[in-house]
């Protein structure tokens, strides 16, 4: 249900007002808290940060911690993540933990799971992390601007037991809406929002254009690729003297298989590769189709060459009962017209699910879920893309299993939280509705989401 700010302040203890100077020298700090009585393990501060995306020019970004994308958070599977989030931005915000199966009150959706964290306030996020893998965190408020300015960061959940990988790297892929002088360009343009989404112009890895990542020669290295972009789908491939295998998709392990053709990595999606690094001095191009994103450079390493690790252990996700599952249809549609926004900042309605366009300015939208699921019951969602543009469909709070598609041969079904639904594609995904609450279900092309392609699904 939706609620007022007064109701939320009476019902939650996580939201607290602090002075804008809170944190002192730790203004951009993300780090381990040593005080056992602090009630949290990490402090994470969102604040303005000057970055140099274009050489010789300064861009006024927003960041979680001292870098954009934000500093990597790490936690071990099955343990608690306790983060005190402090807002030093000029606008309100939240943190959504993308892909994590957690309680509703920790999900970071304004007026659904919590109130927005206003400037000068902090909020304590606390939840147990059930699944290992590559995840990320970002706001769910003013998303085009806040994610576009740099408020994104990786969350890595380490397996309970060692995996056999001795070396690993996290590569955060993001394009930036900046011009040749590093100045901001529009994060969302209606003409582009009605198509593939408003793309950025500068491609970076870990916040750097033309990035070079050094990797140990002769080793099999775990490389986590995270698409933290607002709109862009990367066609991931490698060019060079190397062999690569896919070990996990969107945090969830798969049977290791070669990376062959382009892997289409949509916004919000992640892929875990194992790459056998060649001899020292050799280079591998990480590419988006034919476009080089960055360089992987082999450097001298004293260790003996490593072998391919075994498959990663599966996450503890409930298997859906396909024989007795209830089937539901969800159609991603063009709204049929370009409506005019209002003076209150309401974006146009361009997209809809099952004939309903989400209004991000309406705080009561979640009171009208597009579907209500019974807790513990299995469901098969028929996802139909009735448009000419692809949509990475993301579900909060639960994982689903991809079991069929009219465009892809699903040889090995896999669990995920985000599925890239191609143009005119019809796909089937299955899940157990095991997490009570009202959960967002939306396209992760951000200006598709903000112009209607979002809904609420309730589990009761």
List the predicted regions and their residue ranges.
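N-terminal secretory signal peptides and thylakoid transit peptides that target proteins
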Residues: 1-16
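Extended terminal and domain-junction accessory segments
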Residues: 11, 19-43, 147-179, 255-390, ...
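N-terminal edge beta-strand
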Residues: 56-74, 201-211, 349-375
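Extracytoplasmic beta-sandwich strand-turn segments characteristic of Greek-key/jelly-roll folds
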Residues: 68, 73-75, 99-131, 246-279, ...
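Asparagine-centered strand-capping/turn motif at beta-strand->loop junctions
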Residues: 85-89, 226-227, 383-387
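Histidine- and aromatic-rich segments of cupredoxin/plastocyanin-like copper-binding domains
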Residues: 106-107, 115-118, 186-324, 407-410
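Hydrophobic or amphipathic alpha-helical targeting/insertion segments
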Residues: 129-158
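Active/binding-pocket-proximal capping segment
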Residues: 240-251, 386-414, 446-450, 458-460
């Amino acid at each position: 249900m939706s609620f007022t700010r007064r109701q939320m302040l009476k019902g939650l203890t996580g939201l607290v007002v602090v002075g804008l100077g809170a944190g002192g020298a730790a203004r951009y700090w993300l780090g381990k808290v040593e005080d056992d009585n602090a009630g949290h393990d990490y402090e994470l501060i969102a604040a303005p940060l000057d970055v140099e995306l274009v050489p010789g020019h300064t861009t006024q970004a927003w960041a979680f911690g001292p870098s954009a994308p934000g500093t990597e958070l790490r936690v071990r599977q099955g343990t608690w993540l306790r983060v005190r989030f402090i807002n030093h931005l000029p606008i309100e915000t939240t943190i959504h933990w993308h892909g994590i199966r957690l309680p509703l009150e920790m999900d970071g959706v304004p007026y659904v799971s919590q109130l927005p964290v206003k400037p000068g306030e902090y909020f304590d996020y606390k939840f147990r992390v059930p699944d290992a893998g590559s995840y990320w965190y970002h706001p769910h408020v003013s998303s085009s601007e806040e994610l576009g300015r740099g408020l994104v960061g990786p969350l890595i959940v380490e397996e309970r037991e060692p995996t056999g990988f001795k070396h690993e790297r996290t590569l955060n892929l993001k394009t930036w809406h900046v011009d040749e002088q590093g100045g901001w360009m529009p994060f969302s343009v209606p003409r582009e929002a009605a198509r593939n989404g408003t793309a950025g112009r500068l491609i970076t890895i870990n916040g750097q254009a033309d990035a070079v990542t050094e990797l140990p020669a002769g080793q099999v290295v775990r490389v986590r690729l995270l698409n933290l972009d607002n709109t862009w789908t990367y066609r991931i491939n490698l060019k060079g003297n190397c062999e690569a295998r896919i070990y996990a998709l969107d945090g969830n392990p798969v049977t290791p298989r070669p990376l062959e053709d382009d892997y289409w990595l949509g916004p919000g999606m992640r892929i875990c590769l194992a790459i056998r690094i060649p001899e020292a001095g050799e280079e591998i191009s990480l590419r988006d189709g034919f476009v080089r994103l960055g360089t992987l450079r082999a450097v001298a390493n004293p260790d003996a060459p490593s072998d391919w690790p075994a498959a990663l252990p599966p996450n503890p996700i409930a298997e859906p009962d396909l024989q007795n599952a209830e089937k539901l249809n969800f159609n991603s549609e063009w709204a049929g017209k370009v409506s005019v926004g209002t003076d209150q900042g309401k974006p146009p309605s361009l997209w809809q699910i099952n004939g309903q366009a989400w209004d991000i300015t309406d705080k009561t939208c979640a009171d009208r879920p597009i579907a209500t699921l019974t807790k513990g019951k299995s469901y098969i969602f028929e996802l139909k893309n009735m448009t000419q543009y692809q949509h990475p469909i993301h579900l909060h709070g639960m994982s689903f299993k991809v079991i069929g598609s009219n465009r892809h041969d699903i040889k090995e079904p896999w669990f995920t939280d985000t599925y890239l639904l191609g143009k005119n594609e019809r796909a089937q995904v299955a899940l157990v509705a095991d997490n009570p609450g009202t959960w967002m279900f939306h396209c992760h092309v951000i200006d598709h989401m903000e112009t209607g392609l979002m809904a609420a699904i309730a589990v009761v």
